[in-house]
Amino acid sequence: LATLVLAVLAHAAGNVINDVHDAQSGADAGNTSGIFPFTGGTRLIQLGMVSVRQTRDLARALMLLVVPGGLALALWSTPALLWIGALGLLLAWAYSAPPLQLMSRGLGELTVAAVWSLVVIGADAVQRGSVFIIPVFTSISYGLLIANILLINGVPDANSDASVGKATLAVRLGARGAAWLYALLALLAHGWLAWGVWQFIQPERALWGLASAPLSAAAAVLLWQRASTPEQLRPAIVLTIAAACVHGLAMAAGLLSMRWM
């Protein structure tokens, strides 16, 4: 439970930090084509509901909860959580904060995939007391599907992002290129899981995670069909989020079932 709470708080901190830097760059203010609530930021700052300063203070407050909480959890479980958590927080900060601003260098999707892979690895390490190869391997397919969420979300935001120098993959590749990459990442994610089971790295019931494949396929088709009309991508975005959720939950259910069946 403590692991779940800390993961949620860290995720919230990363999102709030991103809101601050998107507000300062003008990316969210100039975004008139976002698909709320999935793209274009929370818009709380742009609507005047909170100030940039208040948002920054919230990010700091969240970090003040995450850091000592993570240290305590590491002392209780495994010291490995220290480097896992430190790397995750560093990447969450570097995603949008200068001078790195990885999201503006076409590295945002990879960064977020790495962060969520670390969540899987860290959560297992807390329960196990050490880092183990199976969750490391398992986290990759999940991270790739998370990357697809960032990728497809960047398509409706591409024009506003480009106007402020935020060179996401959707900006660099264009909508068609993003659609091709989306399909490739979805194929790699599910192929990676199947290959891992075939090589006996993961147990057979991890294949339950392939339940997300039809969702990813449907989203890929919609993205390809509507690449020139990104304002119509809401169903594809919903399917993409659902695919990541189903992938993780179904795989977890399959692994958990091994205890009773």
Write out the residue ranges for each language-model feature.
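Small-residue-rich segments of transmembrane alpha-helices in multi-pass membrane proteins
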Residues: 110-124, 171-175, 238-251
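C-terminal ends of transmembrane helices
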Residues: 14-20, 43, 90-103, 150, ...
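Helix-coil boundary and interhelical linker segments in multi-pass alpha-helical membrane proteins
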Residues: 1-5, 67-83, 120-140, 191-206, ...
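Extended hydrophobic alpha-helices typical of membrane-associated regions
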Residues: 198-258
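Multi-pass membrane catalytic core of lipid/isoprenoid biosynthesis enzymes
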Residues: 32-75, 170-202, 241-247
